[in-house]
Amino acid sequence: MMAKFICFISRWLLSCRYKVSLNSSNLNKIKAKGVLILPNHPAYTDPMIVFSWLYRWFSPRPLVYESYYQNPLFYPFMVLVHALEVKDVQNDRQPGVHVKKTIQTMVESLKNGQNIILWPSGTLQNQATEKLGGNSAVYEIIQQ
C-alpha cells in the first residue's frame, strides 16, 4: 500500500517534467503471475518512470545495483518494493558466483508468481540499438 502511494507521488513528480503516455487497456487484461518485464534504458530517468507506472499492475521486484540498494536514502524504498540487490561486478572478486546466485533468485521469484523488472543491458542506451554484449541473464532465466 505504501509502495503504491510512493509510486503515485513519483508519477506525479515525474509528470511535471516528462509527458508519459501508457495504453493501460491491455495491462488490465494481464492476470499472469511470474512476469519478466524487460524495458530498455535510454536515459537515467527511465527506470523510475517505467517502474512507477507499472507498479500498480505488476508490483515488480526491480534489480538494483548494490551501491543504490545500500544508499541510506533509498534503502527503505528498496525494502518496501522487495528489490533484488545485485552485486557491482566491477568491484567483485567472484562476479560469476554472485551473478548465478542473482539469476537463481530471479528464477525462484518468477516460479513463485512474483514479477521481475530487469533492464537487460544494465547500462544506458547510447545508440539507436541496444547492445547487450555478454549480458546473458535473460537467456539463463528462460532456460530454467
Predicted regions and their residues:
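Soluble catalytic domains of membrane acyltransferases
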Residues: 7, 16-144
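Helix-enriched interaction subdomains in cytosolic or periplasmic regions
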Residues: 1-9
